Amino acid sequence: MKPQLLLLEDVDGLGRSGDLVVAKPGYVRNYLLPKGKAVVASAGTLRLQAKLQEQRLLQAAADKEESLRLAETLRSLVLDFQVRVDSENNMYGSVTVNDIISVADQKGVVLTRKNFPRAHSGVKTLGKHVIGLKLKEGVTADLHLEVRADHEIAEQKELQSMEEQED
């Protein structure tokens, strides 16, 4: 028989803090109990459930507000990437999730790998791209990227400097 557990933390694919769940014995024995993410349900832990659910509701409201604020910030933000390309404008490598996270961090936007869909493996073409992000509490947002060749950026800077010299 699978044991009934009280989750102390949110666990992806299983439940939220304060939920009573049933999981496979190996998952319970090897992951949930040693990591402190759950306890075996008993009369004492069931009293703890109400307190955990109340805390979860407060945290959920704060997380949703933070996610909505982040989504509003992302609406007006475009992350610009310069990449090396060959003579046929094929990129060397790709713009990875880690690259996106670091550039967003430089712009003051905090993202994590959890925000990106699992299927997203990186941007491998030049141009404008939109990536759907999954934020906390079911809030979604679009992240706008512009991937340009490094020689295009150098040409734009030259044109700007020439225009400034003419003025």
Swiss-Prot record:
Belongs to the bacterial ribosomal protein bL9 family. This is Large ribosomal subunit protein bL9. Keywords: Ribonucleoprotein, Ribosomal protein, RNA-binding, rRNA-binding. Binds to the 23S rRNA. InterPro entries: Ribosomal_bL9 (IPR000244), Ribosomal_bL9/RNase_H1_N (IPR009027), Ribosomal_bL9_bac/chp (IPR020594), Ribosomal_bL9_C (IPR020069), Ribosomal_bL9_C_sf (IPR036791), Ribosomal_bL9_N (IPR020070), Ribosomal_bL9_N_sf (IPR036935). Coiled coil: none annotated. GO terms for cellular component: ribonucleoprotein complex; ribosome. HAMAP family: Ribosomal_bL9 (MF_00503). One of its GO terms (molecular function) is structural constituent of ribosome. GO terms for biological process: translation. The keyword Electron transport does not apply. It holds the Pfam family Ribosomal_L9_C.
